[in-house]
Structures are given as structure tokens and as C-alpha cells.
């Protein structure tokens, strides 16, 4: 399948967590003017769009994913005038704007929910209410953040559903009035020049209307990719996404390839593309996140093969290692010590060689690491604090849990962007809302830009190559060493061209046999000072990666 690509099919998107990007007021919290301040930096990197995580009015129970007003900007972040200026300034540099839409739930501070507390209000039907007794919820479904997924409301003597925090009440998508209001939100932002939407946990919007007990789990099988999810997204697409030319990416929690082939079908009847997270659970032994475990690289490669081959010519992938909910990838699958730079470059080269739209999370392009927090008071994340309390309650050792948090907490990616080696890494003149990484004096944007062999310039080149080489957009995917736990070697083919990507996933030198690599190759990318101009038998250095292209 080849045609002129949509902008996002050969583009790269940069994710900004505004709270931790740049503070311009001294409040200790980043803001929209801080994003404007660094647009030239993002333009230099070469990204096509920026996705901003929520900056709407919010009590900040879940860092803005508890929205109290979808069309008002939280004063902490600025004003609508600031936002309009951001759009204008970004577009003048060829950078599009993507906003985060949290449509599975609202904050319990939202006007709709406040109205819904009255049983007679039409807004009651905007949420999911069920009968029960004060100590007996309607079913045994669990919240993603721990505890029951139901919260009792004494005045109206019913429970409401919250798949996340109790302050995040799930919307009732069965109600057409809810869908109509959410379409208006999309229209509001499209009118202000927004080019795309990232839809938070959007495959959870349709619940099994029977709300059955889950005898084998936490309830997720009754609302994940639920009965009407495709129908609802088809309607949103028909009424808003397509008419307004919005690119859409759905965050898909615990989804399947088969569902994503429908959500992100190239026919474009639901969404443009999907995020799935299976590849970021290869260090969750038995599916358990709160453990210390090395990644299973054979499983990682198997998952990428499954999705690359399963989506090829059928649907569109989003490619990512990092976001605001995941630890830093170089700490997780690479190295924080002497091999940090080649490891960060290798991980970038492996991902950006694949089919799909790559996403870069702020700081990933300079190889930022986890911050190495040592005290529970360092953490801000509701999920981390809840899990620590719950597991301590179960008798688990505090030091063990702190080691797990230092490896797995969502706060690992939420520390301030490291701009310079100055005070607070150049992020704020005030007291930062969360502590800084302990290595910002060495790892920062200023240092990266001054060093032409830094991780930054590898990302810059990968972004440029995506526009230059159509094989990256359209080629197929073949894993050449699926069973190796230390080498990742894949080939992509398209219209008589071949791209070969090889990578050493380990700290040790690894021999690689080139096999039947005939013909004339061009060396395209490498992460050490020099590399073989042709694929041949070689010893790959720690975290070494090479791309060759045959035309």
C-alpha cells in the first residue's frame, strides 16, 4: 500500500508534560509560555507536532487527568490567550498541536458531576450509578489505582463507578447527551487551531451493561474494548474527527491486535493510530508491575513482530518507549553508566526503524535517566503512593518497595526537563513541584546541543530520515534473530529496497553473523564513531546499533 502519506505517517510527534517542561513564573510548575519559549529547540530537533498532556482546570489528583472543565485552562498553566499564541508560534515553525482528551471520566469537581449528585438532575445520567449497600458495592471490580472501582454517595444512596481514582468518575457513554457534549469539546479546540487529539484510555469507554461480578480477575474484561467501543469511536470520527481533519491517537489499555486493527484501520473510520503497552510489560513478571525484574528481550521482540506484521497494510501503529506514565527507557532497557549514550542511541535506532508514527517524550532525546529518588516523600504520583501504602500494609519491606518505585514509578518520567547545569536545571527560578534528577549537571540540553555526538543529534537525524526514506513509512518487517536475547536484527523491504537494522541489547561484546547479505549497501546510521560500510560478520560493541540501506 503506497500513496502520499498523511502528515503523521512520516512525521514524528514530541510529547510535552507541561507541568515539568519549563516554568516562566517562578511558581515551580511548568506553563504554556514555557512551551513557547522552547519552540525553536523543538524546531531544531525537527518534530512535526507536539502533544501536550492536560492543562485544563483540574484539582490535580491525577496530574490533570481529572478534568474539571474541558474548555478552560488551569491558571497554573496560563490563559487561552497564551494557548492561542502557542498555536500561532508553533504553526509558524511548521509544528502542529495535539491535545490530550480525557473522555473516559471527569473530575468529581466537574460541573456535570456536581449536578449529577442530585438524583433528579438530567446530569445524573452522565455518570454510571448503581444500587448497593454502604459496605457492599455493586460488583467486585477494582480501580486501576487500588481498592474498589465503586464509591458510595450517602445522600443519594447509590454508588458511582470510577475505574481510576475516586475523584475520577466514569462517564456514561451510553447516554447520547454525553457524546454530544464531548463532540462540542473537540469542536472548541479544533476551532482554536488544534490538529490532533490523543484520547486517554479510550478503549475503556464502553462497559458491559450487566456489570457482572468478575470471578477470575479485577473486572477489566468487562470494560476493556467493551461492547460498543468501536461504534462510539466510529460515531465520533464521523461527526468530528474526519470533518475537522483531526489526527487521533487512542491510548489502548490492555488491548489486542485484533481490536487495534479495527480502531486504527487504514480506511480511517475510527482513529488514525493506537498506542498499546504490551511491550512495556516485559519486565512485569507474571503481569505484576510492582516487582524488580530484568526485561525479557525475546518477549519484547516477539511483541514488536506481532504488532509490526499484524498492523502492516491493515492499520497504523504509534511507536514509543517513553511517556509520562513510564520510567525512562535508557534506565529501563539500556544503561545509566558508561554506556548511557550508545544505549540511548541504540534504543532510538531500533524503534525509529519500524513502521508507525514515533513519539519522543521530553528528555528522551537527550538520554535523561530515572531520577533515583530514595524517600517516599520524594514521590507525588497517586498510583505510586497508593501502592506503597497498600503493599506496606501487606507487610512488605519499605526499602524493597522504594527500590521498586525507583525503577517503576510514573514519577520517573515526571521530573523537570533538564535544560542546563544551572539552578534547578534551568527549569524554574522557584521551588520545583517535584525533585530533579540527580545528574542534570551532566545530562542537559545545553550540553547535548554543544556536543555533535550527543543523543540529541541521533534523534534529529532519525526524524529527518523518516521524511527522506519512504521504506521507513511503508516497508514490511522481518525479525532475523527472533530467539536471541542479546541481538535485535530486523529487515524491512519495500519496492526493491531493503533496510537492515542490527543492535546489541547488552553491555557485552556480541558476535553477529551477517549471513546472506549480498549486494551493495549504504551505511545510513550508527551509534559509535565508525561502523562497517557493508554488513559483514562482526563483533558488536556494547549497545552498538547500525542501519544499512540497499536500494
Curated annotation (Swiss-Prot):
Biological processes annotated in GO: DNA damage response; oligosaccharide catabolic process; trehalose catabolic process
Reactions it catalyzes: alpha,alpha-trehalose 6-phosphate + H2O = D-glucose 6-phosphate + D-glucose
Subcellular location, principal: cytoplasm
CDD domains: AmyAc_SI_OligoGlu_DGase (cd11333)
Gene Ontology cellular component terms for the protein in this record: cytosol
Keywords: Cytoplasm, Glycosidase, Hydrolase
The keyword Hydrolase is assigned to this record: yes
Site (Transition state stabilizer): 325
EC number: 3.2.1.93
Catalytic residues of the enzyme: 200, 251
Subcellular location: Cytoplasm
MF (Gene Ontology): alpha,alpha-phosphotrehalase activity; alpha-amylase activity
Role, per record: Hydrolyzes trehalose-6-phosphate to glucose and glucose 6-phosphate. Can also very effectively hydrolyze p-nitrophenyl-alpha-D-glucopyranoside, but it does not recognize trehalose, sucrose, maltose, isomaltose, or maltodextrins.
Family per record: Belongs to the glycosyl hydrolase 13 family.
Protein name stated in the entry: Trehalose-6-phosphate hydrolase
Organism listed in the record: Escherichia coli (strain K12)
Amino acid at each position: 500500500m503506497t500513496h502520499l502519506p498523511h502528515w503523521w505517517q512520516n512525521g514524528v510527534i514530541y510529547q510535552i508534560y507541561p507541568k515539568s517542561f519549563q516554568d516562566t513564573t517562578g511558581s515551580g510548575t511548568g506553563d504554556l509560555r514555557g512551551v513557547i519559549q522552547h519552540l525553536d529547540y523543538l524546531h531544531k530537533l525537527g518534530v512535526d507536532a507536539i502533544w501536550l498532556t492536560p492543562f485544563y482546570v483540574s484539582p490535580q489528583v491525577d496530574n490533570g487527568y481529572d478534568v474539571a472543565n474541558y474548555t478552560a485552562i488551569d491558571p497554573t498553566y496560563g490563559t487561552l490567550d497564551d494557548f492561542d499564541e502557542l498555536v500561532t508560534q508553533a504553526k509558524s515553525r511548521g509544528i502542529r498541536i495535539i491535545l490530550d482528551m480525557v473522555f473516559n471520566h471527569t473530575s468529581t469537581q466537574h460541573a456535570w458531576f456536581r449536578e449529577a449528585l442530585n438524583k433528579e438532575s438530567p446530569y445524573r445520567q452522565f455518570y454510571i450509578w448503581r444500587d448497593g449497600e454502604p459496605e457492599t458495592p455493586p460488583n467486585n471490580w477494582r480501580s486501576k489505582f487500588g481498592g474498589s472501582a465503586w464509591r458510595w454517595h450517602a445522600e443519594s444512596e447509590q454508588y458511582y463507578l470510577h475505574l481510576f481514582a475516586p475523584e475520577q468518575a466514569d462517564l456514561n457513554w451510553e447516554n447520547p447527551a454525553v457524546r454530544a457534549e464531548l463532540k462540542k469539546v473537540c469542536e472548541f479546540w479544533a476551532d482554536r487551531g488544534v490538529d490532533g487529539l490523543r484520547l486517554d484510555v479510550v478503549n475503556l469507554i464502553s462497559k458491559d451493561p450487566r456489570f457482572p461480578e468478575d470471578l477470575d480477575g479485577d473486572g477489566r474484561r468487562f470494560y476493556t474494548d467493551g461492547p460498543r467501543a468501536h461504534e462510539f469511536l466510529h460515531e465520533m470520527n464521523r461527526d468530528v474527527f474526519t470533518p475537522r481533519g483531526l489526527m487521533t491517537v487512542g491510548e489502548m489499555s490492555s488491548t489486542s491486535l485484533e481490536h487495534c486493527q479495527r480502531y486504527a484501520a487504514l480506511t480511517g473510520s475510527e482513529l488514525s493510530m493506537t498506542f498499546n503497552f504490551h511491550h512495556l510489560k516485559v519486565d512485569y513478571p507474571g503481569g505484576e508491575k510492582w516487582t524488580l525484574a530484568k526485561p525479557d528481550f525475546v518477549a519484547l521482540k516477539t511483541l514488536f513482530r506481532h504488532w509490526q506484521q499484524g498492523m502492516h497494510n491493515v492499520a497504523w501503529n504509534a511507536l514509543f518507549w517513553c511517556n509520562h506514565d513510564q520510567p525512562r527507557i535508557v534506565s529501563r532497557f539500556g544503561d545509566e553508566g558508561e554506556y548511557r549514550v550508545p544505549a540511548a542511541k541504540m534504543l532510538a535506532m531500533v524503534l525509529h526503524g519500524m513502521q508507525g508514527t514515533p513519539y519522543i517524550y521530553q528528555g528522551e532525546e537527550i538520554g535523561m535517566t530515572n531520577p533515583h529518588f530514595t524517600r517516599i516523600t520524594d514521590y507525588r504520583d497517586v498510583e505510586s503512593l497508593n501502592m506503597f501504602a497498600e503493599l506496606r500494609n501487606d507487610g512488605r519491606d519499605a526499602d524493597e518497595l522504594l527500590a521498586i518505585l525507583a525503577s517503576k514509578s510514573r514519577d520517573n518520567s515526571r521530573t523537570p526537563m533538564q535544560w542546563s547545569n544551572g539552578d534547578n536545571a534551568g527549569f524554574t527560578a522557584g521551588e520545583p513541584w517535584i525533585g530533579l534528577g540527580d545528574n542534570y549537571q551532566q545530562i542537559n540540553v545545553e550540553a547535548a546541543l554543544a556536543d555533535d555526538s550527543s543523543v540529541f543529534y541521533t534523534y534529529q537525524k532519525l526524524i529527518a530520515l523518516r521524511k527522506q526514506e519512504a521504506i521507513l513509512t511503508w516497508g514490511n518487517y522481518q525479525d532475523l534473530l527472533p530467539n536471541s536475547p542479546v541481538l535485535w536484527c530486523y529487515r524491512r523491504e519495500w519496492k526493491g529496497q531493503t533496510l537492515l537494522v542490527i543492535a546489541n541489547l547488552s553491555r557485552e561484546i556480541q558476535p553477529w553473523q551477517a549471513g546472506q547479505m549480498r549486494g551493495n549497501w549504504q551505511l545510513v546510521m550508527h551509534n559509535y564513531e565508525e561502523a562497517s560500510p557493508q554488513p559483514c560478520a562482526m563483533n558488536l560493541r556494547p549497545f552498538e546499533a547500525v542501519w544499512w540501506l540497499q536500494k
